[in-house]
Amino acid sequence: MALLKKINTQVNRIMKNSSLVQNICFDRVPLFIPRLSLTVKYCLAVKLLIYLLYCWYIYSEVPSVSSKFRSFTFGCVVVYHNKFFPRFIRTHSINSIRTFSKFQVIILFSIEKVTRSESKNHSYSKTDISDLHQGYNNPPSRFISR
């Protein structure tokens, strides 16, 4: 997990030098960002992947959540004619990246939850879940310590 944090830091440095909006919140992505460079597109894909792994890590460790969310799907990010906007696509595949001729880039992340038997022996507070919705830039303290 420390490696993910280092990668995220490097990605943030690259994105700071671009015209991309600085503070990207994954549940409220800006609707239109014109003329994204290829570097920024890759950086954004890496950030989404880091966020996906972070969410999987949190959800897989919390028994009360893993019993309720057997499967959940992440939205995909679509870059279409240099316009950047989020679109939510439902799928049952574990991890999909699909491309269509009309779209420059489509990134679709979805994951099917697998309950860990050893997670039943742990107990976590509700703040761990609420911290998840604040985004990757503000992770819970237990995530940083591992």
From Swiss-Prot:
Keywords associated with the record: Cytoplasm, Membrane, Nucleus, Transmembrane, Transmembrane helix
Specify one Pfam family. Pombe_5TM
- Residues crossing the lipid bilayer are 38-60
Q: How does it sit in the membrane?
A: Single-pass membrane protein
Q: What is its main location?
A: cytoplasm
> Which InterPro entries is this protein grouped with?
5TM-prot_SCHPO (IPR018291)
Q: What does UniProt give as GO cellular component?
A: cytoplasm; endomembrane system; nuclear membrane
The listed locations are: Cytoplasm; Nucleus membrane
Give all cystine bridges in this chain: none
Which family does the UniProt entry place this protein in?
Belongs to the UPF0742 family.
What name does the UniProt record give this protein? UPF0742 protein PB2B2.17c
